[in-house]
A protein has these predicted regions:
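Residues that scaffold the ATP/ADP-binding catalytic core of kinase and kinase-like folds
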Residues: 85, 166, 365-368, 509
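Hydrophobic alpha-helix feature that most strongly marks membrane-spanning transmembrane helices
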Residues: 183, 249, 303, 328-331, ...
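Active-site adenylate/phosphate-handling loop in enzymes that bind or generate adenylated species
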Residues: 139, 343-404, 477, 482, ...
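Acceptor-substrate binding/catalytic loop of class I
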Residues: 334-336
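Short low-complexity, flexible loop/linker segments enriched in glycine and/or proline
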Residues: 324-328, 350, 372-374, 556-557
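Cysteine-centered catalytic environments shared across enzyme families
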Residues: 1-330, 342, 346, 534, ...
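Phosphate/oxyanion-binding loops and surfaces in catalytic or ligand/nucleic-acid-binding neighborhoods
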Residues: 26, 79, 142, 163-166, ...
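Adenosyl-5′-phosphate
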Residues: 1-4, 18, 165, 197-202, ...
Length: 601
């Protein structure tokens, strides 16, 4: 795992090094640059050494032909298989790194090589002869990649703070993104909090050549249903999980696992224990409040698998200086209650392991959240009540303003819009009153741009309501909240976190599963729980009520914390500059609207 950055256009060595050094935490083991001012190209790299710790793995790295140069963040787990295929075709390798395999694969097969990669990655390759920059992000968005189109070219980096070191990248705020954040607690889609900084979306690649930019999608998750026995599905899923975990245990440094005691982390740890010849190191965060604490279940799983276990219990006392530093590390506003616990479990792990396996992605893949059942019940109720489509309401709808008319039509006809409303109150919430006189702001909630993360037409054929909900989360919540949080909080600790359940073959298998094998009569993640039964876990452990890793915002609102938070908000710079309305915020505080208060703080 590493930090990458670069530019095409105006720039120099000092700018490139400043960008690179903003990501020292992502790669404290080594650093390098490639700079050709004649062609106006600079690539930077900060290295966290995981595979082949020698200098032969130093980046940026040139291909054997000298035509391509790569700076790369991530891991391609099947690199040895690809390497053997390339060697049969006469390619000679100078190192044992997956970086060189990625570089030579793209040199040999072109962009189609991406389809061979199993893993997580953010890749930048400069082609010297074509004078073309290629940026690639992995299928699920596990690794971040940001870019900005500038006056003279393009700038990119693993983190926004590095991007902003380039003098041609403006720091203007994106008020559209701010409005989205206040509704969903994170910033969805390709936007960021900075108007001229964009995310390269998951499963996309970008080419930049002499001012022309093209962005293409190289992978889609298609939901198709197959009729097979539960045993047949479980056999295939078990094989894929064991294979994915085994591939992610390859490293030249110590490895371990996060263990919450939930279904997903239990699946991952049990698979690791079956594969490993040594006791697996596990790391667990607990809470003093039993409402959120699952450490007793983590201890049960750890003892059952004979692990070497480490525990940390969190008090509901906020280290405000630390939390402000974490928001800086996150690059953008993020009102996720598990931000600090994620940082703390990463910090507790880094002295004992350099690579960690995590169960992230299980809830989105196998319908683990309660919101999926709520949405299913809502959609079933609509059918029972025979709520008509937009055609029946057209005479009323056509009298609405154009922007509201468009949203109402989509709401009636598009289940992704209904899911966004049921989950976030996206269309009924209005934060117009929160903004102060110092901000010339118009709300963008009706703007087409602010809803691009809900456009799912390409996935609709044959999809169920639950599939639609999953796709919304795959396009937004998973990459823009969960995976962004894990990446930033792990990398600030110079720790690589791998997510076996987000192996794309597991995703494609899960997309073929009947909904009833994910959510069955109120039982979420049904097939994963059946797999744990196969692995001899007791039913009272498997079917207990889910608590989740993130405490609610109320957990942090102790009397002492609340006083500091309220003082920060009402006397903070944003209120003084009249960006936010003090009157509105005071009203929300008096109503104990902790969610809004937390978002704003």
């Amino acid at each position: 795992m590493c930090g990458i950055c670069g530019f095409v256009g105006n720039g120099n060595k000092s700018i490139l090094i400043n960008m690179r050094e903003k990501m020292l935490h992502r790669g404290p083991d080594d650093a390098g640059i490639y700079l050709n001012l004649e062609n106006q190209i600079g690539l930077g790299h900060r290295r966290l050494s995981i595979i082949d710790l020698s200098e032969r793995g130093r980046q940026p790295m040139e291909s054997s032909s000298g035509e391509n140069v790569i700076t790369y963040n991530g891991e391609v787990y099947n690199y040895l298989e690809i390497k053997r295929e390339l060697e049969k075709n006469g390619i000679y390798f100078r190192s044992n790194t997956d970086t060189e395999v990625v570089l030579e694969a793209i040199q040999y097969w072109g962009i189609k090589a991406i389809n061979k990669f199993h893993g997580m990655f953010a890749i930048a390759i400069w082609n010297k002869s074509k004078k073309e920059l290629l940026l690639i992000r992995d299928r699920l968005g596990i690794k971040p990649l940001y870019y900005s189109i500038t006056q003279s070219g393009i700038v990119f980096a693993s983190e926004i703070k590095a991007l902003l070191e380039h003098p041609e990248v403006p720091k203007d705020l994106n008020y559209n993104a701010l409005d989205c954040y206040l509704k969903v607690d994170y910033i969805p889609g390709n936007r960021t909090i900075f108007k001229y900084v964009h995310k390269l979306l998951p499963a996309h690649y970008l080419t930049y050549k002499q001012g022309d930019i093209n962005i293409n999608k190289y992978w889609n998750l298609r939901f198709t249903k197959e009729k097979r026995s539960v045993t047949s599905w479980m056999d295939e899923l078990e094989d894929e999980i064991l294979s994915s975990v085994k591939a992610r245990m390859i490293a030249d440094v110590p490895i371990g696992a996060f263990l919450s005691g939930g279904i997903d982390s239990t699946i991952i740890l049990t698979a690791m224990a079956r594969i490993s010849k040594e006791p697996v190191k596990t790391f667990t965060i607990g809470f003093t409040d039993d409402m959120y604490d699952e450490s007793q279940y983590a201890k049960f799983v750890a003892e059952r698998n004979n692990t070497k276990s480490y525990y940390k219990i969190i008090e509901p006392q906020i280290d405000f200086d630390l939390l402000k530093r974490l928001i800086y590390q996150a690059d953008e506003p993020l009102a996720d209650g598990s931000l600090m616990p994620t940082y703390l479990v990463c910090k507790a792990s880094k002295d004992y392991a350099k690579v960690i396996l995590s169960g992230d992605g299980g809830d989105e893949t196998f319908l683990g959240y309660e919101k999926y059942e709520r949405f299913l019940n809502y959609e079933l109720s609509r059918k029972k009540l025979k709520i008509p489509s937009s055609t029946r309401f057209y005479e009323i709808i056509k009298k609405l303003p154009i922007a509201k008319r468009s949203i109402m039509l989509r709401y009636l006809n598009d289940s992704s819009y209904r899911y966004a409303e049921l989950t976030y109150g996206y269309f009924s919430k209005s934060y117009t009153d929160i903004y102060g006189d110092g901000l010339n702001f118009k709300t963008y909630q009706n703007d087409k741009e602010s809803l691009d993360w809900l456009v799912l037409d390409e996935h609709k054929s044959g999809s169920s309501a639950l599939n639609t909900a999953q796709m919304v989360d795959y396009q937004s919540y998973l990459p823009d909240d969960i995976l962004m949080k894990v990446d930033k909080m792990s990398m600030v600790n110079s720790l690589e976190v791998r997510v076996p359940l987000l192996e794309h073959r597991i995703q494609e298998l899960a997309a073929r599963l009947p909904d009833s094998l994910k959510l069955r009569q109120g039982v979420s993640k049904f097939i994963l729980k059946e797999l744990l039964k196969r692995w001899d876990y007791p039913e009272d452990f498997i079917y207990r009520r889910k608590k989740g890793f993130a405490p609610s915002n109320r957990f942090w609102f102790t009397s002492e914390n609340k006083k500091i938070i309220i003082d920060d908000i009402l006397n903070g710079q944003a209120v003084k500059e009249k960006i936010f309305s003090k009157k509105y915020l005071t009203k929300r505080i008096n109503k104990k609207d902790y969610n809004t208060v937390w978002r704003v703080w």
